[in-house]
């Protein structure tokens, strides 16, 4: 609260100062820039506002007002409380001023629609844009302080409305989500106030809540709250403190232009994403409103992006990671889309970086960073996936997509944002950097690729992916004490962390020694336990469980049904089949064994026996790895 209040007051004060300067946006920019330097985070806000006013003045002005108001409101909910508690009438006044100023912007630009709600919120604000509004604003603030959520909601709604004015539907969605999230965001605002202040411009972005729907569209919670909460929890966890440091540490990102960006804001504030008048439906590929929401969300995320990525990075905690992985798996498709977007964004960011090196590149760096982090998390994910499931990469995705989007949004937001959405197509993926590709083909993705329709695989699969996946696998193996490199000693080495399905693959892969007890049926990946008790006995030896029997072993196998690793073949006793690619299967079982040692030949032989020739090596390898990670997930939970 303190920070948010301070940020808010600074924000408001600069705003009030800029109130007069408002007419001179350039001056505002300069002033903001100056302020920016003095008060970094506060500057951000002014800076952002500046960006807002400057870049988005006409359209954004509405957004600005709304976003500012909403930002204020959102911040206010808590901040207002704090303010009222702090008897920061001054702050309120500044806020009022700010409101009027915002109003002036919006009023000046005649963006009343956004202000419809705003008016409701700042009843007097709009009417008497400059001084008169203060009381109403004050009232509003007071009201907000008394009922921060309502106001925050209203403000958010306003923001979304103004922001969404371009997309009325979006605004509605945004409003709802924003409303829902306003309190959340209020928190967020407090925590990330600085950067959220930069968000102010993007308060509309704050609409991010709406994006949740976008996320929901991706299979995440459609409710922004779920997503936001997850993100909030995840992000805030690591980000709150981190955010301050990171956020500020990333001044380039936060105030890309703070840093003597030669052009104050030739590009509207980096985070000043005015949602393109036409919602970048492409990104969310949902409805336009959702697209707008998504855009908002992305934009928001861009600002939020910092913390999200921090969170993820910082907190590549199991929750985040696991959630990321699993949700990523779930949303891999969407994720991929987003990743594509993200990648595109990254590309665009890169391009933008060229355009706006600082911001961009902070952002971009961040972005890349985040992606890298995410990838890293992804690596971690398998184990954490379960716990993190909630937060899931959805957050990641959205964050990543968001991240990417934001920067890119910010930079190319106006022009490129749409293009980005359009470009989100898989092709973009290809264009995207390896890191992105890896991210796309992250373990979850790979796992998904193995488990899910091959259609996904193409996107997921990439040479880079393979290596990425391999890394993950290696990590997995290392974590499980499995030796990926020593193929020959695979089984003995994997003891303890070896999973039953891996053990079965190993047996099937050694027909000379195991043909008597287990063998491929020759129908795809079907295999039969010819001597189930012998298999169970060997498994018991492997796991040092002398009491192991087929009854217990079959229970373990049933666990794999749920995991999508294998299925029971109906109508036949002791006949099971692996659901994933053979290649993926072996890769998962042996790591990179396929490329290494005689086992590779054997494995090929086994594959031929299985009569399921591997599809694309890359895809399969990747899939297996991922699948493996997926499995480990399970394995980590249940080591049979």
From Swiss-Prot:
Organism: Drosophila melanogaster
Phenotype caused by lack of the gene: RNAi-mediated knockdown in the central nervous system (CNS) during development increases the expression of CaBP1, Calr and ERp60 and regulates expression of other genes involved in a variety of processes including oxidative phosphorylation and redox reactions, lipid and sugar homeostasis, and translation. It increases susceptibility to starvation but has no effect on feeding behavior. It increases triacylglyceride (TAG) levels in normal-fed flies but has no effect on TAG levels 12 or 24 hours after starvation.
Pfam families named in the record: Ets
Family named by the database record: Belongs to the ETS family.
Annotated gene: Ets96B
Coiled coil: 321-356
Composition skew (Basic residues), residue ranges: 356-369
Stretches with biased composition (Polar residues): 609-624
Low complexity biased stretches: 322-355
Ranges of the DNA-binding region feature: 498-579
Protein location: Nucleus
Name of this protein: ETV5-related protein Ets96B
GO cellular component: nucleus
Alphabetized UniProt keyword annotations: Coiled coil, DNA-binding, Nucleus, Transcription, Transcription regulation
Stored PANTHER family: ETS, ETV5-RELATED PROTEIN ETS96B
Tissues expressed in: In the adult brain, expressed almost exclusively in dopaminergic neurons.
Induction description: By starvation.
Major subcellular site: nucleus
Region (Disordered): 315-375, 609-628
């Amino acid at each position: 609260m303190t920070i948010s209040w301070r940020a808010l007051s600074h924000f408001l004060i600069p705003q009030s100062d800029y109130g007069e300067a408002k007419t001179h946006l350039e001056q505002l920019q300069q002033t903001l820039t100056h302020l920016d330097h003095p008060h970094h985070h506060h500057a951000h806000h002014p800076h952002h506002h500046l960006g807002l006013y400057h870049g988005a003045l006409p359209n954004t002005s509405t957004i600005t007002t709304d976003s500012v108001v909403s930002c204020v409101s959102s911040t206010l909910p808590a901040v207002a409380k704090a303010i009222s508690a702090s008897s920061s009438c001054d702050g309120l006044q500044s806020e009022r001023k700010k409101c009027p100023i915002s109003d002036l912007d919006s009023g000046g630009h005649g963006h009343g629609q956004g202000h419809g709600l705003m008016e409701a919120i700042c009843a007097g604000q709009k009417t008497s844009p400059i001084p008169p509004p203060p009381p109403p604003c004050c009232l509003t603030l007071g009201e907000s302080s008394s009922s921060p959520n309502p106001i925050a909601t209203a403000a958010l709604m306003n923001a979304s409305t103004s922001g969404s004015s371009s997309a009325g539907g979006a605004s509605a969605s945004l409003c709802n989500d924003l409303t829902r999230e306003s309190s959340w965001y209020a928190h967020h605002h407090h925590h990330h106030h600085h950067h959220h202040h930069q968000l102010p411009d993007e308060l509309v972005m704050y609409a991010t809540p709406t994006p949740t729907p976008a996320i929901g569209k991706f299979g995440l919670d459609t409710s922004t709250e779920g997503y936001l909460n997850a993100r909030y929890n995840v992000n805030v966890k690591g980000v709150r403190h981190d955010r301050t440091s990171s956020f500020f540490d990333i001044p380039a990102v936060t105030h890309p232009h703070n840093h003597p960006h030669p052009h104050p804001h030739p590009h509207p504030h980096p985070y000043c994403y005015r949602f393109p008048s036409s919602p970048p439906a492409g990104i969310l590929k949902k409805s336009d409103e959702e697209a707008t929401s998504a855009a908002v969300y992305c934009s928001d995320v861009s600002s939020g992006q910092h913390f999200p990525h921090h969170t993820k990075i910082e907190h590549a905690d199991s929750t985040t990671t696991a959630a990321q992985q699993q949700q990523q798996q779930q949303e891999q498709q969407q994720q991929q889309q987003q990743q594509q977007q993200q990648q595109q964004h990254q590309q665009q960011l890169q391009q933008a970086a060229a355009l706006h090196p600082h911001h961009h590149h902070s952002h971009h760096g961040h972005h890349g960073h985040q992606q890298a982090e995410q990838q890293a998390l992804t690596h971690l994910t398998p184990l954490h996936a379960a716990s993190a499931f909630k937060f899931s990469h959805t957050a990641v995705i959205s964050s990543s997509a968001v991240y990417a989007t934001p920067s890119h949004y910010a930079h190319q937001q106006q022009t490129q944002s749409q293009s980005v959405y359009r470009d989100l197509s898989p092709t973009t993926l290809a264009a995207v950097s390896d890191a992105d590709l890896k991210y796309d083909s992250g373990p979850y993705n790979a796992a998904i690729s193995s488990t899910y329709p091959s259609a996904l695989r193409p996107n997921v699969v990439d040479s880079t992916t393979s290596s990425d996946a391999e890394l993950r696998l290696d990590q997995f193996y290392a974590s499980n004490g499995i030796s990926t490199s020593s193929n020959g000693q695979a089984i003995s080495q994997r003891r303890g962390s070896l999973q039953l399905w891996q053990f079965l693959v190993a047996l099937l892969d050694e027909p000379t020694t195991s043909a008597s007890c287990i063998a491929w049926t020759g129908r795809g990946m079907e295999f039969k336990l010819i001597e189930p008790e012998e298999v169970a006995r060997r498994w018991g030896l492997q796991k040092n469980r002398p009491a192991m029997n087929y009854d217990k072993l079959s229970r373990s196998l049933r666990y794999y049904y749920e995991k999508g690793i294998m299925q029971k073949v109906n109508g036949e006793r002791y006949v099971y089949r692996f659901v994933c690619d053979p290649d993926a299967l072996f890769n998962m079982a042996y790591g990179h064994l396929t490329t290494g040692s005689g086992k590779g030949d054997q494995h090929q032989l086994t594959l031929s026996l299985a009569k399921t020739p591997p599809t694309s090596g890359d895809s399969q390898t990747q899939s297996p790895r991922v699948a493996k990670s997926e499995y480990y997930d399970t394995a980590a939970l249940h080591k049979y």
